[in-house]
Amino acid sequence: KTCEHLADTYRGVCFTNASCDDHCKNKAHLISGTCHNWKCFCTQNC
């Protein structure tokens, strides 16, 4: 099962899923990331 949560350490407006995904994978060491309503959300196992 996976859960999504707001990436508090992501800076700025989330325009592209690629930048959010990169942040979640490389900075937060989570599965992936996507933009929702201009915010970056990371996906993790829960």
Swiss-Prot record:
One Pfam family named in its UniProt record: Gamma-thionin
InterPro entries registered for this protein in UniProt: Defensin_plant (IPR008176), Scorpion_toxin-like (IPR003614), Scorpion_toxin-like_sf (IPR036574)
Tagged with keyword Acetylation: no
UniProt keyword list: Antimicrobial, Disulfide bond, Fungicide, Plant defense
Keyword Disulfide bond: yes
Entry similarity comment: Belongs to the DEFL family.
Function: Possesses antifungal activity sensitive to inorganic cations.
Descriptive protein name: Defensin-1
Organism of derivation: Pisum sativum (Garden pea)
Species lineage: Eukaryota, Viridiplantae, Streptophyta, Embryophyta, Tracheophyta
